[in-house]
């Protein structure tokens, strides 16, 4: 959007930005504009170049060519410190906090004294509707609260250009609405917001302007209301995409059968029985999951879902109750023994807990099973394993020794799934598998999960995206304040019912809810 002498220049004007890594072109002469008081949404598939472009604007990476202007003034040799001085702040998709510092120390870190105003910080927190304990260590926060701390760091720096990379990926609907209210207040003050998201309804709700990146270029750009949802999706993934895995992919994905057999699956015996289990953040939880079943676990942030998953995996202590895996009592087992028995956990935060970002791809996939192979590496075996999962999961990478951190978010998530599958699970606990993943990669991951379940693996599927819980799960348990507030199956499995139960509204939801809840109670009594 060019400006004239009568109109003020754009807040941010990017012209002809290009970038290569090791001879591979990742940005091709990008033009991008942000006006004061505007939300400019940026979409694109994983690897489209969104993060690279934003890192250049934030001074993290230098461009190979092109210019960046703020208020019409060219910015040369931009660095993160200089970007902060100019009012540019990038809130990353994966929170980058100091785990051993308090929330307050993280928010005020490296702020000049004249900006380190605790009263202002308290006012901002109140306006966001946040109830963060400023004294606790940031490492103790869940991902949603860590994201809010990152946003607070930007707001405390009086940012005029706020880059939000998937800011709502781990937020509840209520937290998302509060964030949007705060963004709208900032817009009235002339702040411009670059909003990176894969959630099209949010973009429709918030963004004035939308740009779609594909293969390092701009495939579509204009006023949001000028484009239909289908047009935007087509710009992201123009090729007609088959939603089913090919027979070849299914063959490559076939898991070893020593832990799962047709006879065992047909016996209808539960793979896992959780009996009146209590631990940090939850109490008196009972349920069963059978071979080939996908059990959805829904609830708002803080409901205790991740705490329950980590306790089942042995990362947190049990304070009461029992866990049986195929009639073997694993309640007192260490994590390594649970893993060896067939209980595998895909964590919520792939970068902090799931993958070794600076290690090679092949080593990451092999890492869960290395304890069974001794201390020596097996390059040929690692290469063969990675190649199998590359074909099965369509993981895109350049070479085997490539560090994980160089992959896009969707490919990192597929690599984490490969790592979990190589451990040969009986029960796979999947926590937020599509957080920060684009539309195309989400479809891939859904099909992968269904294919895994079809091989008689029991799956516990945890997600804050209630629509995908309904889409993926055979049954749904809803948690509220650490307890099961409802069990749903059949026609009772819908977003509205789950939302009511997630907020503790114990209204009668019909016979499917009643029968399913009674079933959950019976499962606890059967241990």
Swiss-Prot record:
One of its GO terms (cellular component) is plasma membrane. Its main location: membrane. ATP binds at residues 44-51. It catalyses: ATP + H2O + (2R,4S)-2-methyl-2,3,3,4-tetrahydroxytetrahydrofuran-[AI-2-binding protein]Side 1 = ADP + phosphate + (2R,4S)-2-methyl-2,3,3,4-tetrahydroxytetrahydrofuranSide 2 + [AI-2-binding protein]Side 1. It is a peripheral membrane protein. The keyword Membrane applies. It holds the Pfam family ABC_tran. It is found in: Cell inner membrane. The keyword Transport applies. Residues 12-240, 266-506 form the ABC transporter domain. Its EC number is 7.6.2.13. Keywords: ATP-binding, Cell inner membrane, Cell membrane, Membrane, Nucleotide-binding, Repeat, Translocase, Transport. Signal peptide: none annotated. One of its GO terms (molecular function) is ATP binding. Part of the ABC transporter complex LsrABCD involved in autoinducer 2 (AI-2) import. Responsible for energy coupling to the transport system. The complex is composed of two ATP-binding proteins (LsrA), two transmembrane proteins (LsrC and LsrD) and a solute-binding protein (LsrB). Belongs to the ABC transporter superfamily. AI-2 autoinducer porter (TC 3.A.1.2.8) family. This is Autoinducer 2 import ATP-binding protein LsrA.
